[in-house]
Amino acid sequence: MKFSERIIEWQNLHGRNNLPWQTNDPYKVWVSEIMLQQTQVSTVIPFYENFMKSFPNVLTLSKANLDEVLKNWAGLGFYRRARNLHQTAKIITDEYHQVFPDNYEDLVALPGIGESTAGAILALAFNKKGTILDGNVKRVVSRYLNVENNPSELKKSIKPFS
């Protein structure tokens, strides 16, 4: 059995399959990926649901007052993430006419979107090839390949899988 088949089989048996952001909506994927940075899933779920009630789409987020965005973010910490969300929502609204870019280069050029977040948006929202290299993925791949969790060594080792 291939490595990818083993991972998919494990995920089907033990993974989280009913999270509110598991959708092909790039806005929902993006917001969840930003919230999940340095924050556990169980903590994020109620914040995500409340945030979506206040800002159900990129336009409402872009038109919101920053203080309102920060108020909705209160309790999650790392407030720079909320500021970047707000700034990026404005860019997507103004420069991309509320349509998320569907290519890596445009995504990583946006404030607060790095390699892993761009990979998640591409893979989950657009069904395109994208590498999601968060802490959990790094841990699993480094154990499977018996590679030190050294970022540059791990990136080289994971390339054939992405």
Language-model-detected regions and their locations in the chain:
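Catalytic cores of DNA base-excision repair glycosylases
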Residues: F3-S162
